């Protein structure tokens, strides 16, 4: 058992499933050394469909998530919340959905 902070490379389920749960010859973030051929096949199938058939890929991700939950492969103890204080004189500040505690400032303007 271990605790660590990890953020996805990009805002897509494949970043979570591939990095944390897919078995590989070279282990990177699958630190539990999980080796589930059924889960690997579903992840691979979802990756292949992500661009061409998003709905089918989403169904694969739902199935993969069910396998992960049913087998208790991961246990999320908590999710850290972040608070941002933004001056009323500015607008356009948005949070990055893939990275908590990262704010996107490229659209910031004054009111």
Question: Each predicted region: which residue ranges?
Answer:
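Bilobed periplasmic-binding protein-like "clamshell/Venus-flytrap" ligand-binding domains
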Residues: 2, 52-88
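Hydrophobic alpha-helical scaffolding
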Residues: 7, 29-32, 54
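Alpha-helical protein-protein interaction elements
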Residues: 8-9, 53, 70, 97-98
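Short, solvent-exposed loop/beta-turn-alpha elements that line the ligand-binding surface or hinge
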Residues: 15-45, 49, 79-111
């Amino acid at each position: 058992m271990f605790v660590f902070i990890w953020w996805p490379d990009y805002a897509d389920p494949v970043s979570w499933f591939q990095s944390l749960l897919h078995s590989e010859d070279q282990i990177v973030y699958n630190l539990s050394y999980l080796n589930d051929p059924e889960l690997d096949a579903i992840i691979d199938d979802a990756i292949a469909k992500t661009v061409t058939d998003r709905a089918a890929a989403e169904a694969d991700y739902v199935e993969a998530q069910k396998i992960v939950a049913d087998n208790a492969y991961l246990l999320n103890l908590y999710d850290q919340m972040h608070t941002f204080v933004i001056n009323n004189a500015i607008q356009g500040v948005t949070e990055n959905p893939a990275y908590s505690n990262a704010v996107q400032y490229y659209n910031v303007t004054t009111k």
